Amino acid sequence: MKKLKYLLLKLFSKKNIHTKPMNTADTISKKSFYEFKLKSLDGKEIDFNQYRGKKILIVNTASECGYTPQYAELQELHETHGKKVTILGFPANNFGGQEPGSNEEIGAFCQKNFGVTFQLFSKSSVLPPDQNPLYQWLTQPSLNGWNAEAPSWNFCKYLVDENGQLLKFYSAAVSPLSEEVLKEIG
C-alpha cells in the first residue's frame, strides 16, 4: 500500500525546481552556510565548517509520509555519490503530523527500514514560527541571497554548492536520483 501511495504521489505531484539566478551582488548569501552548528539525531553538535568544499543536499524528512521511500533513494545517492555530495536529513513534523517519533525512534526507523548512514539531525521545525536556523537561511532571501521557497511538504530538497551558496530548490516530487539532481551533483 505504501509503494502504491508513493507511486501515486510521484505521478500526480508537481516537480518544482528553482535555480539561483546568475551571480550578481544581490544573490550572494548574507550569512555563511558554514556558520551553522546544529544537533545531530544523537545530540552531538555538528559544525557545518566540516562541509566546506562539498556540495550538500538538505532534505526535510518524515517517517509516515507517502514520500518516505525517498529515504532509500537518499541512501543510494549517499552510497554511490558520497564523494561528490553530502546528504543532511532534517526530520520534521510540520506536514500532517507525519513525523511523530522521538529522535531515538526516528533513528531506529531509518536504520531498520532503509539502512540510513547519512547524517540526520535532531527533529525540528522547518517552518515558522519555530523554524530552525538553517531553514531560516534556506528560505529567506535576506540571508541566502535569492530563495524564498519554503518546504511545501516532506522531502523537499535544497542543494548548496561547494562555496556554501544555495544553488537549487527541489520539490518533494523530485527524486534524489532524478536526472535533474544527478546533473547538478556532477
Question: Language-model segments: which ranges?
Answer:
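Short, internal strand/loop/helix patches
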Residues: 104-152
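Conserved helix-turn-beta segment immediately C-terminal to the redox Cys motif
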Residues: 54-55, 64, 68-93, 110-114
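Amphipathic alpha-helical repeat scaffolds
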Residues: 40, 60-64
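Short hydrophobic helices that act as membrane-entry/anchoring signals
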Residues: 1-17
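Thiol-/selenol-based redox modules, centered on thioredoxin-like
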Residues: 133-136, 140-186
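Thiol-based oxidoreductase modules, predominantly thioredoxin-like and allied folds used
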Residues: 60, 84-102, 117-128
